[in-house]
Amino acid sequence: MTTKTRFAPSPTGFLHVGGARTALYSWLQARANNGEFVLRIEDTDIERSTQAACDAILEGMNWLGLTWDEGPYYQTKRFDRYNEIIAQMLEKGTAYKCYCSRERIDALRESQAANGEAQKYDGCCRDLPARDTDEPFVVRFKNPIGGSVVFDDHVRGRIEFSNDALDDLIIARTDGVPTYNFCVVVDDWDMGITCVVRGEDHINNTPRQINILKALGAPIPEYAHVSMILGDDGAKLSKRHGAVSVMQYRDDGYLPEALLNYLVRLGWSHGDQEVFSLEEMKQYFKLDDINKAPSAFNTDKLVWLNQHYIKTLDPEYVATHLQWHMDDQKIDTSNGPALAEVVTALAERAKTLKELAASSRYFYEDFADFDAEQAKKHLRGVALEPLQLVQQKLAALTEWTVEAIHLAIEQTATELDVGMGKVGMPLRVAVTGAGQSPGLDITLFLIGRSRSEQRISKAIEFVADRINS
């Protein structure tokens, strides 16, 4: 049997990291077993579902590279199918119309609560004969009486629910709209889903869904209910812990490879290995290796992984993601070095692509002023001679290469009998406007000859004015 999994988010908000991890685990289960992965949008909550949320989910999945083989399917486009099955169930007697009023249901719950009883429907309409009436009704599934529902969860082991603890679930509301728990069952059946990977908050839905599947004569998929993700303070991950939207991590400068690597390790492991390529994830992933204990989100670990991937992935590839941040920060990359060269130069220092973009601005744009603190420290009178001599050395170069630039700076320090810092720091502030950059040779090379010479002249003028003031 072909493995077939699905990711089925509700479009009531963005794709958060918990959902992204579930999608990743489901995707890996399919890919590790040469199976198929389905994307399904569960939009039966019509009032809360939005097109913007749908778009955000698709954008997040595409950015992560979690491609799907089927879909996206939308539940709101399958209402005819759900109603067809409901009609069949009413005909077979596995479902029934319930005419109980809201007032009766509320009174029942109040009475049960007062008596310390579990709050559930009492089956009042379960065995009533059919009515020819215009009274409003819901449709309820006729849940089995007695016995239990047992399933082996890949994460949590054997789970058992008593049928006596389950009431007759509403599968269609008074307006005729089918309910979430019913739509899920029909979808999983129609789409041939063999393994359901989802959050632990769905565990209580599982026995109800299994009973409906049995009533339909449909196969029962395997289940894996993964634990929640906690913040570093032990509370459930929420907005107050920082970014929880997948695309917020994109905006903050993380590579998809870093986020995927981090998410896969939030509950799953393979020995002591920390860094996994997507191919390695597919090779090693097994649902049975997922830990059932909650996992705590650690941003420092994500930053470490992001640094690793910025440094080790192909600079040309990293540059494609960096371009988004350059555009976002309104840096025109057409007037300067190739972005891949900038990635190579700055990768060792960068924690995020957002940070890398900000620190590379001087390669593409002239700055109005020198950093005040750095200028005060390094563009003093003693810097005039080193700047003038290095300017002469650079102007005399027959070729603008990293090696030639390095030699010119080195010769300047040698001729003046000073340490490299006495030349390097004033020169760095001169060409970048600040006090940090990669090696000066690669920095000047990437800035370009004309722009470098203009900036050094500007710094010499700045120092001269300072001497004369």
From Swiss-Prot:
Which cellular component terms (GO) are annotated to the entry?
cytosol
Principal place of residence = cytoplasm
Q: Which Gene3D superfamilies match?
A: 1.10.10.350, HUPs (3.40.50.620)
Which residues are connected by disulfide bridges in this protein?
Answer: none
Q: Which residues bind Zn(2+)?
A: C98, C100, C125, D127
Q: What class of enzyme is it?
A: ligase
Q: Where in the cell is it found?
A: Cytoplasm
Q: Does the keyword Cell division apply?
A: no
Q: Name one GO biological process term.
A: glutamyl-tRNA aminoacylation
Write the protein's name. Answer: Glutamate--tRNA ligase
Main role?
Answer: Catalyzes the attachment of glutamate to tRNA(Glu) in a two-step reaction: glutamate is first activated by ATP to form Glu-AMP and then transferred to the acceptor end of tRNA(Glu).
Gene Ontology MF terms in the entry: ATP binding; glutamate-tRNA ligase activity; tRNA binding; zinc ion binding
InterPro entries, per this entry? aa-tRNA-synth_I_cd-bd, aa-tRNA-synth_I_codon-bd_sub2, aa-tRNA-synth_I_CS, aa_tRNA-synth_I_cd-bd_sf, Glu-tRNA-ligase_bac/mito, Glu/Gln-tRNA-synth, Glu/Gln-tRNA-synth_Ib_cat-dom, GluQ/Sye
Provide the catalytic activity annotation.
tRNA(Glu) + L-glutamate + ATP = L-glutamyl-tRNA(Glu) + AMP + diphosphate
Q: Which gene is transcribed and translated to give this protein?
A: gltX
